[in-house]
Amino acid sequence: MGLYQAKNDEGSDPKSSSKIDDLIENEAEIIRLIKEDGKLLIDNGDGRDIHNIIQEDKLLSVEFNEVLKRFHGEEKSDIPRKEFDEDEDDGYDSNEHHQKTIEVMNTLNHVINKEVIPPENFSHVVGEIYRSSFPRQENFSFLHERLKLKSILVLIPEEYPQENLNFLKLTGIKLYQVGMSGNKEPFVNIPSHLLTKALEIVLNPANQPILIHCNRGKHRTGCLIGCIRKLQNWSLTMIFDEYRRFAFPKARALDQQFIEMYDDDEIKRIASKNNWLPLQW
């Protein structure tokens, strides 16, 4: 996302509130950038940003916070955001993974067949392509006996758990790993070439049935599925609706922007060459 810039008229006072008033009234997105990142720069040659100017003018600061309440229903926080921290939904936690398995196994009714326990956020995508959150031990029978997977594509950069590797070795399921970080501000984005590489793996019928997963099956998986839907000629409205349903309550605007802006020319060329399209339901 580019930085917004407000240019003062020649000779105008950079502390004047009229320019900011205009921005406040007309640009909700700019207000969001100011609130979260302090990135609305004043191009007057002194390198100061809007935050500095507002802090120097107490009256303007009070007025500005009142406007923030209108847009966000809360006061502007002075606590700086940790910009590069992993979202809890993105980072794989082996202890959490193991603990959830214990909890599920302890509460299962023994009458229930393990074959019917899919991973969280599981869904059929198209053909023999599936999506889910990170599979755990209680899901292994479902993946092998019900889905009869040939491959798993994992989209996290962390090392794959040993118990999962043992399961794959035992069943002959092939593991593909295309590690990527999630789309998070300010400048952490999924590289397009990694998405293309992942799509090439998924679309290849030789790898199907295939399961796609990240940690929670929301963001990185959602971006990949969104790009598959583009190849199916879905409308953006339908694509974003599906993305938001799986990402709820943490849908990311940057993920949806990535899906919209992703250049699929290369994967279309590869898919056409190998007769992978159109995808069959």
From Swiss-Prot:
Biological-process GO terms, alphabetical: actin filament organization; diphosphoinositol polyphosphate metabolic process
Keyword Cytoplasm assigned: yes
A cellular-component GO term for this protein: cytosol
Domain Tyrosine-protein phosphatase: residue ranges: 121-271
Catalytic activity: 5-diphospho-1D-myo-inositol 1,2,3,4,6-pentakisphosphate + H2O = 1D-myo-inositol hexakisphosphate + phosphate + H(+); 5-diphospho-1D-myo-inositol 1,3,4,6-tetrakisphosphate + H2O = 1D-myo-inositol 1,3,4,5,6-pentakisphosphate + phosphate + H(+); 3,5-bis(diphospho)-1D-myo-inositol 1,2,4,6-tetrakisphosphate + H2O = 3-diphospho-1D-myo-inositol 1,2,4,5,6-pentakisphosphate + phosphate + 2 H(+); 1,5-bis(diphospho)-1D-myo-inositol 2,3,4,6-tetrakisphosphate + H2O = 1-diphospho-1D-myo-inositol 2,3,4,5,6-pentakisphosphate + phosphate + 2 H(+)
Quaternary structure and partners: Monomer.
Primary location class: cytoplasm
Site description Transition state stabilizer, residues in chain: 220
Entry binding sites for 1D-myo-inositol hexakisphosphate: 189-190, 193
Cited InterPro entries: PFA-DSPs, Prot-tyrosine_phosphatase-like, Siw14-like, Tyr_Pase_AS, TYR_PHOSPHATASE_DUAL_dom
Pfam family, one: Y_phosphatase2
Chain intervals with Basic and acidic residues compositional bias: 7-20
Miscellaneous: Present with 4070 molecules/cell in log phase SD medium.
PTM annotation (Phosphoserine): residues: 94
Protein name according to UniProt: Inositol diphosphatase SIW14
pH dependence of activity: Optimum pH is 6.
Annotated source species: Saccharomyces cerevisiae (strain ATCC 204508 / S288c) (Baker's yeast)
PANTHER family in UniProt: INOSITOL PHOSPHATASE SIW14 (PTHR31126:SF48), TYROSINE-PROTEIN PHOSPHATASE (PTHR31126)
UniProt-listed Enzyme Commission number(s): 3.6.1.52
